[in-house]
Regions:
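Long, contiguous domain-sized segments
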Residues: 1-47, 51-52, 65-68, 92-302
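Short hydrophobic beta-strand that contains or immediately precedes a catalytic carboxylate
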Residues: 54-56
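Adenosine ribonucleotide-centric catalytic and binding domains
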Residues: 59, 63-102
Length: 302
């Protein structure tokens, strides 16, 4: 019996679902090549990697569940800490920005800033107290901070960890998706993904749904296992000209392989790029001690 072990550690879930449901988006797979000509693409040698690349990421944490009292009624909320930052790689890697913010996310109209011994939680309104709505409000605030920090630095290529949605306005931004839960390609075009070699990409395709974006798949080096091992999906704004997004896809394919992580150093190798992994660790460190903040909140509520 022959078998292979996935380098992506099991405690992070599966990088690729065993059965990928079809997307509800409309896909135009003939942006760069017609369907019959689909095959793996190696970036041309005349498409060198950009000398300056900015990597951005954000992290968040719920510090406590909160109930805001209003007479006999109570309204739910969350006290949360979130952070965003950017790493500039221009021959060396440097954290060029990192900010931490906190908030009381709630729909309670009578909510006030919560003052603790070490920190405070200003009120950040949410449309309702539904847990999913509160979580989305937190995610949106983190995304807004990430956009602000990314736009403050001049780099021809900005790698955004996660989907591009909401961050299309950042010049040079490319969404970087490490895991796969939906199938955007079918038939012979999907089979091209399995045929990718290290550093190769698929042709660019266009996805149209509630928002439109260009996309392509790329295989990073150091991947073993199933046909999707080491495969990431990239997204670019649909506002790009076709020729520009093809050049961008080539630049990304030329740039990212050297940043791919190794299994003995990162449990999410090779998809968890070194600059993003390092930035995530730094941002989580800056969130502060969760147990201390929880105690502070309990004291403030007493």
């Amino acid at each position: 019996m022959r078998f292979a072990i996935e380098t992506w550690a099991p405690e992070y879930g599966a990088a690729t679902d065993h059965e990928l449901p079809e997307t509800g988006a409309t896909v135009d797979a003939e942006i760069e090549r017609d369907l019959e000509s689909w095959s793996p693409i190696t970036p041309p040698s005349l498409s060198p990697a950009p000398e300056r690349i900015l990597f951005t990421d954000g992290v968040r944490r719920v510090d406590a569940q909160v109930w805001i009292e209003d007479g006999a009624a109570s309204c739910p909320g969350i006290c949360a800490t979130y952070a965003a930052g950017a790493v500039l790689c221009d021959g060396r890697a440097e954290v060029v920005s990192a900010e931490v913010r906190r908030g009381l996310f709630t729909a309670a109209p009578q909510a006030e800033r919560i003052m603790c011994r070490h920190v405070s939680y200003p009120v950040l309104s949410a449309p309702s107290g539904d847990p999913d709505v509160l979580s989305l409000a937190l995610q949106q605030r983190m995304g807004e901070l990430e956009i602000t920090l990314a736009a403050a630095h001049d780099a021809p290529l900005v790698i955004v960890d996660g989907p591009l949605r909401g961050r299309q306005s950042v010049p040079g931004a490319v969404g970087y998706i490490k895991t796969h839960h939906v199938s955007y390609l079918q038939g012979a075009q999907e089979q091209v993904i399995a045929a990718l070699g290290a550093g190769q990409r698929t042709p660019v395709f266009l996805m149209m749904s509630s928002w439109s974006r260009f996309s392509w798949y790329l295989r990073l080096p150091g991947s073993i296992g199933h046909p999707w091992a080491g495969v990431v999906r990239c997204e670019a704004s649909a506002d790009h000209e076709t020729s520009d997004v093809i050049a961008l896809a080539d630049a990304v394919a030329a740039a990212l392989p050297r940043f791919s992580s190794q299994p003995h150093k990162d449990p999410r190798a090779p998809q968890n790029l070194y600059p993003i992994a390092g930035l995530e660790r730094e941002l989580r460190r800056r969130l502060g001690d969760a147990a201390l903040l929880y105690r502070d909140l309990r004291v403030a509520a007493a």
